[in-house]
């Protein structure tokens, strides 16, 4: 005896499925989160994973670099570990928060971001100098903020806004370049006044690159390069640089002239990087790190810790991860249909590429010492916050203005 089959229905000539053939099971939370056009699907997860790994490496290196001196002083050996881990976690939260903001809204916030940054750069001169520099603002609880790190973000937003608005009227001309310089010069002047030469170099390179990428006429760029180059050549040695900064450049050109003085940092850095061999001594087992022979080894010279304790394999891994960050930022710039987004992504890519090159270069002796942290790795809350906010800006551009959604 045959069983009764489920009824089927015909509506306007179309046969609908029989009863019971539809699945009533809802999709999983993960499936819904990564569904097409969902927020998480629009994120660049390669970029997120890479910066997370870099931050984790940084936490471990900072811990290894600071533990010996803290133990010798009878202090908590995990102090810097806890701080850096906390700052990295807060940085990731900031990254995700910024990624949810449409980049067009970021453009409307540019005047406020720029103004707040200028006020912060002015406020540092009301504080006491640390190691001869007015670079930090003291906050309750023993925390400090370094406004010059956020000047990179303010500059990129300001230049992107200027060139986007000028592009609506045609190819950017002299007026647009002068407006861009009017945004860049105050930041450069205040940062140099601190003094923070490394940050000033980043700001200068980002400014020059964004002017070129904006589509400004070549004759204007050439004339500007001649004028700026001549001005720097005339006053650079006597007014722009402090005596110790000139000494750093001299020691870079003649590294063996004063190994016990101006050339000490560079010499010890090269020894530390080269002593690790292929695989390094292992975390917490570096004799040069433990002896604290390299000054500022948890900040500007964190790459020396990687060189000694992680060896060539570890350092090349860090370089590869930083390279991926730059490539992903450039990829976002190429695949963006909005000029403001293109300039934002390009500015961030140049920032990370140049700063990484200078930091690593000064530890291996191919660049002078300028006092720049290694992005995502060096110790410091302001630096990692600025780095993560920049990654959030990249995610925002990708989510809202990317031509492709892969």
Which role fits each region the language model picked out?
Residues 86-94, 309-327:
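Hydrophobic alpha-helical transmembrane segments
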Residues 163, 201, 206-220, 287-314, ...:
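Interfacial segments of multi-pass membrane proteins
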Residues 101, 192-193, 211, 326-338:
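Interfacial segments of transmembrane alpha-helices in multi-pass membrane proteins
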Residues 93, 101, 158, 240, ...:
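Transmembrane alpha-helix boundary/anchor motif
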Residues 332-370, 377:
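Loop-to-helix entry and N-terminal half of a specific, functionally important transmembrane alpha helix
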Residues 2-54, 60-195, 360-373, 379, ...:
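Membrane-helix boundary/helix-loop-helix interface segments in multi-pass membrane proteins
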Residues 130-138, 144, 220-317, 337-341:
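Hydrophobic, glycine- and aromatic-enriched re-entrant/interface helices and adjoining loop segments
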Residues 111-112, 118, 174-192, 197-238, ...:
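Hydrophobic alpha-helical segments of polytopic membrane proteins
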């Amino acid at each position: 005896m045959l069983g009764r089959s489920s009824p089927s229905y015909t509506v306007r000539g179309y046969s609908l499925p029989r009863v019971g053939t539809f699945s009533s099971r809802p999709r999983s939370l993960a499936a819904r989160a990564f569904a097409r056009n969902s927020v998480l699907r629009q994120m660049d997860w390669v970029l997120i994973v890479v910066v997370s790994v870099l931050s984790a490496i940084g936490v471990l290196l900072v811990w290894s670099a600071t533990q010996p001196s803290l133990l010798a002083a009878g202090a908590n050996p995990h102090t810097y570990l806890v701080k850096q881990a906390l700052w990295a976690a807060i940085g990731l939260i900031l990254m995700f928060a910024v990624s949810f903001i449409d980049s067009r809204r970021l453009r409307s916030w540019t005047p406020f971001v720029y103004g707040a940054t200028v006020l912060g750069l002015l406020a540092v001169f009301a504080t006491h100098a640390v190691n001869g520099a007015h670079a930090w603002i003291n906050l309750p609880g023993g925390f400090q903020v370094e406004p010059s790190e956020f000047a990179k973000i303010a500059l990129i937003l300001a230049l992107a806004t200027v060139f986007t608005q000028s592009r609506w009227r045609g190819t950017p001309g002299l007026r647009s370049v002068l407006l861009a310089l009017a945004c860049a010069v105050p930041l450069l002047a205040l940062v140099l006044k601190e003094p923070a030469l490394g940050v000033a170099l980043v700001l200068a390179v980002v400014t020059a690159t964004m002017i070129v990428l904006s589509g400004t006429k070549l004759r204007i760029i050439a004339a500007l390069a001649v004028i700026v180059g001549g001005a720097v050549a005339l006053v650079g040695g006597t007014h722009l640089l402090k005596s110790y900064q000139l000494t750093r450049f001299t020691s870079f050109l003649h590294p063996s002239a004063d190994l016990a003085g101006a050339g000490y940092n560079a010499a010890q850095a090269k020894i530390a990087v080269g002593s690790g061999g292929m695989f390094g001594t292992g975390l917490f087992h570096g004799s040069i790190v433990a002896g604290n022979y390299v000054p500022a080894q948890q900040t500007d010279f964190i790459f020396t810790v990687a060189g000694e304790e992680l060896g060539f394999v570890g350092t090349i891994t860090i370089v590869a991860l930083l390279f991926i960050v730059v490539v992903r930022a450039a990829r976002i710039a190429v695949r963006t249909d909005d000029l403001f987004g293109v300039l934002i992504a390009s500015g961030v890519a140049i920032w990370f590429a140049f700063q990484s090159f200078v930091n690593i270069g000064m530890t291996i002796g191919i660049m002078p010492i300028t006092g720049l942290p290694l992005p995502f790795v060096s110790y410091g809350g302001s630096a990692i916050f600025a780095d993560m906010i920049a990654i959030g800006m990249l995610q925002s551009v990708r989510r809202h203005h990317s031509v492709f959604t892969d």
